């Protein structure tokens, strides 16, 4: 399988949850390599926006995007953002579609915080993930939260 290149043995020996964790780890490494190369080629002129920051505060990011590419926000843009429930009060307040539910999405629990929702998802994953894969997931989460978005702890 092409997306398991250079980690085929881990892929074959892993369960589905571990495969996803290892895939995310490997795609993150590859993305970081390409990002470094692009930054050196383009003098650091790369705009990276986390999904979480965007759905919680889209106006700031839409202004940055439009000024970067020399365009403006249109009514069509605003319509699509409304269809996607952007802005949101919580990241996990996505649009309620059957396809998302089939893939495991659930609306946030009443009175939960962002951290509560992340902890719930981690507990679900931990039931099936191997010990080593869970360590990788926790490392990835920590790195992501340090670099892009940290909802804090209760």
Please state what every model-predicted region is.
Residues 1-48, 54-154:
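PAPS-dependent sulfotransferases, especially Golgi type II membrane carbohydrate sulfotransferases
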């Amino acid at each position: 399988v092409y997306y398991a290149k250079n980690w085929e043995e881990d892929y074959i020996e892993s369960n589905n949850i571990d495969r996803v964790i290892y895939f995310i780890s490997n795609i993150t490494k590859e993305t970081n390599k390409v990002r470094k190369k692009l930054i050196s080629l383009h003098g650091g002129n790369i705009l990276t926006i986390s999904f979480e920051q965007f759905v919680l505060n889209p106006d700031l990011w839409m202004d940055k995007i439009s000024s970067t590419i020399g365009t403006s926000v249109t009514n069509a843009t605003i319509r699509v953002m409304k269809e996607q429930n952007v802005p949101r009060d919580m990241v996990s307040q996505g649009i309620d579609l059957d396809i998302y539910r089939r893939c495991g999405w659930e609306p946030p629990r009443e009175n939960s915080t962002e951290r509560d929702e992340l902890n719930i998802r981690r507990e679900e994953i931990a039931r099936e993930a191997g010990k080593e894969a869970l360590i990788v997931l926790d490392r990835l989460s920590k790195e992501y939260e340090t670099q892009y978005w940290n909802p804090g702890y209760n």
